[in-house]
């Protein structure tokens, strides 16, 4: 959010969380975008498309730094928190799980390491023959996900058969517990059809940002001071909610 302040006084101001600062990010097309002002951080309910809470910070504040403060402001905790890969940090996964919710966040490849033995490069468990195992659903009461033998599930025709790995008629099966790796082990499991379906709902956040910028004067703000900017953005959010009620 750009605010019209004398930026030549920037060197005289402290980065204390209240003064305007330069912000930088890449847009949806990968182009660099800079602005001088503040940044609005929102939590949006994907069903209504309306905000549940927000914070305002100087523009140089990283988005991920406001994830936990926003969660703490929530009156009711949702089932899922959907965030983009900029929020891919272990402290955020842990905070979400402590609140009894699930984090649906794409992996930031810069944070990745070589997968442990028994996992492919997508962090998907493989059997002793190297075949990806079949996802068999989440077990919420155990905070775990279950995988089964791809041969007995009819996904692969393993020439060794299922007895190679297990004496069970169902073949080899395994559980992964979220507490062991909350970043990679999600309920539902990362990159399954259900996981992708849930993540797609995150578009509600971008739509709301676009709406208040284009229609409610949230983009260029002609006032100074964090408290005034916060009040202005609160009015933008409130106006959007009133319009939503009227248009029902």
Model-inferred region functions:
Residues 50, 97-99, 113, 143, ...:
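Alpha-helix termini
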Residues 1-98, 102-108, 113:
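Polybasic low-complexity intrinsically disordered regions
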Residues 79, 133-135, 221:
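Short secondary-structure junctions
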Residues 75-76, 116-117, 122, 126-128, ...:
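Short, intrinsically disordered/low-complexity patches at protein termini
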Residues 195-248:
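Basic, amphipathic alpha-helical segments enriched in Lys/Arg and hydrophobic/aromatic residues
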Residues 93-210:
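Helix-centered, glycine/charged polyanion-binding patches within enzymatic domains
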Residues 86-89, 130-131, 244-247:
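A general structural signal for short secondary-structure boundary/capping elements
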């Amino acid at each position: 959010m750009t605010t019209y302040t004398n930026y030549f006084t920037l060197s005289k101001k402290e980065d204390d969380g209240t003064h305007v600062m330069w912000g930088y990010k890449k847009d949806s097309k990968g182009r660099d975008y800079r602005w001088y002002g503040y940044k609005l951080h929102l939590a949006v309910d994907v069903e209504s498309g309306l905000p549940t809470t927000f914070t305002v910070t100087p523009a140089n504040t990283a988005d991920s730094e406001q994830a936990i403060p926003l969660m703490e402001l929530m009156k009711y905790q949702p089932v899922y928190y959907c965030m983009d890969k900029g929020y891919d940090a272990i402290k955020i996964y842990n905070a979400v799980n402590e609140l009894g919710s699930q984090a649906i966040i794409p992996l930031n490849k810069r944070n990745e390491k070589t997968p442990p033995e028994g996992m492919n490069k997508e962090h998907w468990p493989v059997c002793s023959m190297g075949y990806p195992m079949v996802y068999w659903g989440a077990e919420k009461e155990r905070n775990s996900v279950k995988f089964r033998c791809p041969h007995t599930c009819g996904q692969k025709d393993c020439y060794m058969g299922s007895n190679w790995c297990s004496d069970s008629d169902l073949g080899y099966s395994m559980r992964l517990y979220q507490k062991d790796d909350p970043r990679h082990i999600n309920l539902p499991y990362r990159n399954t059809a259900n996981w992708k379906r849930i993540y797609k709902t995150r578009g509600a956040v971008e739509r709301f940002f676009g709406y208040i910028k284009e229609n409610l004067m949230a983009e260029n703000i002609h006032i100074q001071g964090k408290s005034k900017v916060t009040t202005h953005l609160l009015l933008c959010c409130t106006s959007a909610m009133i319009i939503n009620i009227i248009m029902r």
